[in-house]
């Protein structure tokens, strides 16, 4: 009876993976008493095939879930319509509640029938036995056998806790349950006294900004968190996850962040290979509709690196909602997991981000300054110009206020706090992070990210002459035109390197540098072009084109 109840309440099972020889326990090691032997039959190496009763019951419950999601998103319009028609009176609501209660009872009955179907299936009974054993005792053998199954991630046991590192338990400098530290925007009116009257005047605007951010704004910014989109992408995500596990020996793990969100991760270990880059770990930060199952992790994987992918809060197996604070909390536990559980030193970690993932990447670079390098592909400096691009001009004040208070993705500000090597990849046909049209390459916000970084690190070089010549170089629409501008100013790379190395030897590596202070205008132009070319590479493609492995290069450093 207990097993039947477990089948009724158990998670949905999607796939049973092939048994990987590299993960099997050595023959000399006896199994623990709590371990449950997983099946090795090749007939199970496929998507889980439910019996007819479970299959039909699952279809009914999935359809009900979709209808509930549609009802949730359309509820404001539905309530408005019902109110206008006078259907929200007590005499109309009571019968409706009876219908809703009856429907819930019917769905509960369908769930019980699904449980009976699972109970009659030996594959599911074997799976639920392993899952229960793992929850009782998270031994390495139980977790190894559980990894052979792909199921609803909500039932996956937590593998790593944000407080697990001993250094955080002993010190008070780590994150609290309220979250990690973020850079906050400065008040718009610093000289205005924050009186009670001013607070009351601001209250309607603050309420409006909050509602916009938590309804339309968040879903526009992170469409991957919308349930209906995830439901449509589920087959693709399952296929991508199977590829990572079966072909790349990926290991899935659930991390618990300081805000209580559970973060879905996938780790591919290449340290045992002959390739030297396998000793380096690339932490991948996906875009606003990207998932590690089908996202940018493929680029460093093809290049031979060890890779750690993770999903934003609210994406696929990760819980929560993707607001900046939750995003930073998630990134923090991912980096901690890489250091304290996977055993990588910060000097062996590379942060790689695509598009909106630049926010968490730059936050990690700012918060963990010892990481080896940062690579930002198709990213931007600040969210406000991009948000204003897609909203009406009459909403400018509301959009700016909402972004600054609730969705402040200040990539450039965070990146300037990092002292290590940085590489920016600009898509020359990018249609997403341009503020006008894709053909107008100067409206690409990656340009502004580069300029802000160089102006912070080399303020004397990026004075009038240097800034002007870098802008000309950024306007180049082809490699030929770019090379023409570079050669027009006769940039001597050996001279530029000697100047920078001499300054570093005398003054140390910490930015900002005052190099170029006593330099001629021609020298500043040469140095500015040299630095711009080292920090930004062009890739002739649109925003969503996968980055080829040969374009995944380590940033330049002295």
From Swiss-Prot:
Q: Which GO terms describe its molecular function?
A: monoacylglycerol lipase activity; phospholipase activity
Alphabetical GO biological process terms: monoacylglycerol catabolic process; phosphatidylserine catabolic process
Transmembrane portions of the chain: 60-80, 93-113
Q: Where in the cell is it found?
A: Membrane
One GO cellular component assignment for this chain's record is: endomembrane system
Record Gene3D superfamilies: alpha/beta hydrolase
Give membrane topology per the record: Multi-pass membrane protein
Provide the top EC class.
Answer: hydrolase
Q: Which reaction does it catalyse?
A: 1-heptadecanoyl-2-(5Z,8Z,11Z,14Z-eicosatetraenoyl)-sn-glycero-3-phosphoserine + H2O = 1-heptadecanoyl-sn-glycero-3-phosphoserine + (5Z,8Z,11Z,14Z)-eicosatetraenoate + H(+); 1-hexadecanoyl-2-(9Z-octadecenoyl)-sn-glycero-3-phospho-L-serine + H2O = 1-hexadecanoyl-sn-glycero-3-phospho-L-serine + (9Z)-octadecenoate + H(+); 1-octadecanoyl-2-(9Z,12Z-octadecadienoyl)-sn-glycero-3-phosphoserine + H2O = 1-octadecanoyl-sn-glycero-3-phosphoserine + (9Z,12Z)-octadecadienoate + H(+); 1-heptadecanoyl-2-(5Z,8Z,11Z,14Z-eicosatetraenoyl)-sn-glycero-3-phosphocholine + H2O = 1-heptadecanoyl-sn-glycero-3-phosphocholine + (5Z,8Z,11Z,14Z)-eicosatetraenoate + H(+)
What superkingdom heads the lineage?
Eukaryota
Q: What is its main location?
A: membrane
* Topological domain spans for side Cytoplasmic: 114-558
**Cross-referenced Pfam families, in alphabetical order?**
ABHD16_N, Abhydrolase_1
Keyword set includes Transmembrane:
yes
Question: What positions does UniProt annotate as the active site of this protein?
Answer: 355 (charge relay system), 430 (charge relay system), 507 (charge relay system)
- Which UniProt keywords are present, listed alphabetically? Hydrolase, Lipid metabolism, Membrane, Transmembrane, Transmembrane helix
Domain AB hydrolase-1: residue ranges = 281-407
Which EC numbers characterise this protein's activity in its record? Answer: 3.1.-.-, 3.1.1.23
Q: What does this protein do?
A: Phosphatidylserine (PS) lipase that mediates the hydrolysis of phosphatidylserine to generate lysophosphatidylserine (LPS). LPS constitutes a class of signaling lipids that regulates immunological and neurological processes. Has no activity towards diacylglycerol, triacylglycerol or lysophosphatidylserine lipase. Also has monoacylglycerol lipase activity, with preference for 1-(9Z,12Z-octadecadienoyl)-glycerol (1-LG) and 2-glyceryl-15-deoxy-Delta(12,14)-prostaglandin J2 (15d-PGJ(2)-G).
| Family stated for the protein in its record | Belongs to the AB hydrolase superfamily. ABHD16 family.
Its protein name is Phosphatidylserine lipase ABHD16A
What's the gene?
ABHD16A
């Amino acid at each position: 009876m207990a097993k039947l109840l477990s089948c009724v309440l158990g998670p949905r099972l999607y796939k049973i993976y092939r048994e990987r020889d590299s993960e099997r326990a050595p023959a000399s090691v006896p199994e623990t008493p709590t371990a449950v032997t997983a099946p090795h039959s090749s007939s199970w190496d496929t998507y889980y095939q439910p019996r007819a009763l479970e299959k039909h019951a699952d279809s009914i419950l999935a359809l009900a879930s979709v209808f509930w999601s549609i009802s949730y998103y359309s509820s404001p319009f539905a309530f408005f319509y019902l109110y206008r028609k006078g259907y929200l009176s007590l005499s109309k609501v009571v019968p409706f509640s009876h219908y809703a209660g009856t429907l819930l009872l019917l769905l509960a009955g369908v769930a019980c029938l699904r449980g009976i179907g699972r109970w009659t299936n030996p594959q599911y009974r074997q799976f639920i036995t392993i899952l229960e054993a793992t929850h009782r005792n998270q031994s390495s053998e139980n977790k190894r056998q559980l990894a052979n199954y792909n199921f609803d991630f909500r039932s996956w046991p937590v593998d790593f806790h944000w407080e697990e590192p001993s250094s955080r338990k002993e010190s008070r400098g780590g994150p609290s349950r309220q979250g990690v530290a973020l850079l906050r925007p400065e008040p718009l009116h610093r000289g205005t006294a924050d009186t009670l009257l001013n607070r009351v005047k601001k209250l309607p605007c603050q309420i409006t900004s909050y509602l916009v951010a938590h309804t339309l704004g968040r879903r526009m910014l992170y469409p991957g968190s919308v349930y209906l989109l995830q439901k449509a992408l589920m087959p693709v995500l399952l296929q991508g996850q199977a590829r990572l596990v079966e072909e790349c020996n990926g290991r899935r793990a659930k991390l618990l962040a300081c805000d209580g969100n559970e973060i879905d991760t996938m780790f591919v270990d290449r340290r045992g290979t002959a390739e030297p880059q396998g000793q380096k770990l690339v932490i991948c930060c996906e875009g606003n509709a990207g998932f590690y199952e089908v996202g940018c992790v493929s680029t460093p994987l093809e290049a031979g690196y060890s890779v750690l992918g993770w999903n934003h809060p609210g994406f696929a197996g990760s819980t929560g909602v993707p607001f900046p604070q939750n995003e930073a909390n998630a990134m923090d536990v991912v980096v901690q997991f890489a250091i304290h559980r996977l055993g990588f030193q910060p000097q062996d970690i590379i942060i790689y981000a695509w598009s909106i993932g630049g926010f968490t990447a730059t936050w990690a670079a700012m918060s963990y300054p010892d990481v080896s390098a940062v690579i930002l592909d198709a990213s931007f400096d600040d969210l406000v110009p991009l948000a204003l691009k897609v909203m009406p001009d009459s909403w400018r004040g509301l959009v700016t206020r909402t972004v600054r208070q609730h969705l402040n993705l200040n990539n450039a500000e965070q990146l300037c706090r990092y002292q290590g090597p940085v590489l920016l990849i600009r898509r020359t046909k990018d249609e997403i992070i341009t503020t006008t049209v894709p053909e107008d390459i100067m409206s690409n916000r990656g340009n502004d990210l580069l300029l802000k970084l160089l102006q912070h690190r080399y303020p004397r070089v990026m004075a009038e002459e240097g800034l002007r010549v870098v802008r000309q170089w950024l306007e180049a629409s082809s490699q030929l035109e770019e090379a023409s501008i570079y050669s027009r100013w006769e940039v001597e790379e050996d001279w530029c390197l000697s100047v920078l190395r001499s300054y570093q030897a005398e003054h140390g590596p910490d930015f900002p540098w005052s190099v170029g202070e006593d330099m001629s205008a021609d020298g500043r132009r040469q140095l500015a072009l040299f630095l711009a070319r080292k920090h930004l590479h062009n890739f002739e493609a649109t925003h969503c084109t996968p980055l080829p492995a040969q374009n995944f290069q380590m940033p330049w450093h002295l």
